[in-house]
Amino acid sequence: MLRIADKTFDSHLFTGTGKFASSQLMVEAIRASGSQLVTLAMKRVDLRQHNDAILEPLIAAGVTLLPNTSGAKTAEEAIFAAHLAREALGTNWLKLEIHPDARWLLPDPIETLKAAEMLVQQGFVVLPYCGADPVLCKRLEEVGCAAVMPLGAPIGSNQGLETRAMLEIIIQQATVPVVVDAGIGVPSHAAQALEMGADAVLVNTAIAVADDPVNMAKAFRLAVEAGLLARQSGPGSRSHFAHATSPLTGFLEASA
């Protein structure tokens, strides 16, 4: 069971809504993933009506919506988008995204921290997308963010956990949930994130662009479950030396 702020989730896999070939395929993949928290970009949704092609099927699916501020380049733009989302969707949950460079889509640490502090004060449950910077993640936690979402690699790159060393530090020091976001390309990446101690992962591109998004979503669900179970089972420690799995000495002595 995963708890973030006032909500609990059975699934440790969060999903996105971008890049799917159709809304129907998006919903089928989300259902196959078992995800209960789904993020959507406010710039892609018609907030004036709930029969929007993206919004309506998500509401019907009964998932928790996590609007994000993707497209915002400054703290001010992100805060404006947050208030629009709260008014239109009736939720104070927010994935905070601020990336001024359209080429790399890397989060702006200064603007993100600035916006996060203000949004928390305004009553939002803030989940910030951020770089894998242990100091920044601690600062975001200190200003009241409900979780931190450090990247594994650049958005949509499918490179995996390129920031593993920093993620391990973030996880070790965090007192709020850590959700690895961005760069996860295959189910094994997700399993590794859960094994190393992450509380959840957010996956979008890897599912949406797969030849079979529904089965890929199912694969991610199983990988996350496996990674979590492996961590809870207490894996053996790594060693530089070989250790025999059978006690050969006793066998030889008995045969003598």
Swiss-Prot record:
Catalyzes the rearrangement of 1-deoxy-D-xylulose 5-phosphate (DXP) to produce the thiazole phosphate moiety of thiamine. Sulfur is provided by the thiocarboxylate moiety of the carrier protein ThiS. In vitro, sulfur can be provided by H(2)S. One of its GO terms (cellular component) is cytoplasm. It catalyses: [ThiS sulfur-carrier protein]-C-terminal-Gly-aminoethanethioate + 2-iminoacetate + 1-deoxy-D-xylulose 5-phosphate = [ThiS sulfur-carrier protein]-C-terminal Gly-Gly + 2-[(2R,5Z)-2-carboxy-4-methylthiazol-5(2H)-ylidene]ethyl phosphate + 2 H2O + H(+). SUPFAM superfamilies: ThiG-like. The active site is at residue 95. Keywords: Cytoplasm, Schiff base, Thiamine biosynthesis, Transferase. GO terms for biological process: thiamine diphosphate biosynthetic process. One of its GO terms (molecular function) is thiazole synthase activity. Homotetramer. Forms heterodimers with either ThiH or ThiS. It holds the Pfam family ThiG. This is Thiazole synthase. Transmembrane segments: none annotated. Pathway: Cofactor biosynthesis; thiamine diphosphate biosynthesis. The lineage of its organism: Bacteria, Pseudomonadati, Pseudomonadota, Gammaproteobacteria, Enterobacterales. It is found in: Cytoplasm. 1-deoxy-D-xylulose 5-phosphate binds at residues 156, 182-183, 204-205. Belongs to the ThiG family. Its EC number is 2.8.1.10.
